[in-house]
Amino acid sequence: MLSLEGVTKTYRVGAFGTSTLTAVDDVSLDLAPGEVVSLIGESGSGKTTLGKMVLGLLPPTRGRITLDGERARPGKAYYRHVQGVFQDPFSCYNPVFKADRVLTMIRGEYFPGVADSEWQGRIETSLKDVGLDPGQILGRYPHQLSGGQLQRLLIARALLLDLRYLVADEITSMLDASTRIDVLNLLADLKARGLGVLFVTHDLSLGNYISERAVVLYRGQVVESGSTSAVFGNPLHPYTTRLLSSVPRLTARWGGGEDDGPGEVPGPDGHEGSSTLVEAEPGHLVRRAVTGTTSLRSAS
């Protein structure tokens, strides 16, 4: 189990660092093997910051991230099981390295004792597992591959490890529609094999398509979480309702005069003061105002 417990990230801002900015505020969630959890929010909601903390690219200011009950510590032992794929696949490659070298570097770092012939077989298997033809990929530079091929190559590289959890941060936003569906279906196949996926997205339709659970972030806080069917089918927080109202429907036409949904959302809980997540329905949590301060805990 990959778990986040009260994870918070604050930054010092201002000319002399006298002010603080809270990018992620007391977030808790669990990701199980074979589960896809969508982390949903607009730009600036804190979802990418949260993903970077899971990957050890940023340290939490407070809280804990654990893997099977042990505190996550960035390093070989952790990255052998937890990897990430990002929005712009080109930024993840050295432009002078061919695909062969990208994959072979994994052996030098993690499996130095594996023979050349065995490693080549592993490479070909991992490429085929993500729908890539080794003959068309190996020997090519990143600029010679499409965005979809580069995303698949990143996933194939991760599969060469003992991968258990994948952070997928906006990985389809730069892909065309057909390639996007191919990558999503690939994640679904990997999920069926036991891979846990934290799917970071601002696109509600993709979150609805791929995940069993949805966690909605607003200004760094979880405002609603639960099964995807509950959160999307019966949204209980005004921010979630506003997000859903912005998704085009097949029965609606642009400029048709339909209801635009709720207006501005005043704050994470819609009220002044402190707030907490309460269980409105079994497994369906929503942020509400309270009189006292209670720690936030999302659904397991």
Language-model regions, residue ranges each:
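ABC ATPase NBD coupling module
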Residues: 15-18, 70-83, 97, 101, ...
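Helix-to-loop junction immediately C-terminal to a conserved catalytic motif
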Residues: 55
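Conserved ABC ATPase signature
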Residues: 141-145, 149
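A short, proline-enriched helix->beta-strand linker immediately N-terminal to the Walker B motif
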Residues: 160-164
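A short, surface-exposed alpha-helical micro-motif characterized by mixed small hydrophobic
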Residues: 207-209
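Charged, flexible cofactor/metal-binding loops and thiol motifs
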Residues: 227-299
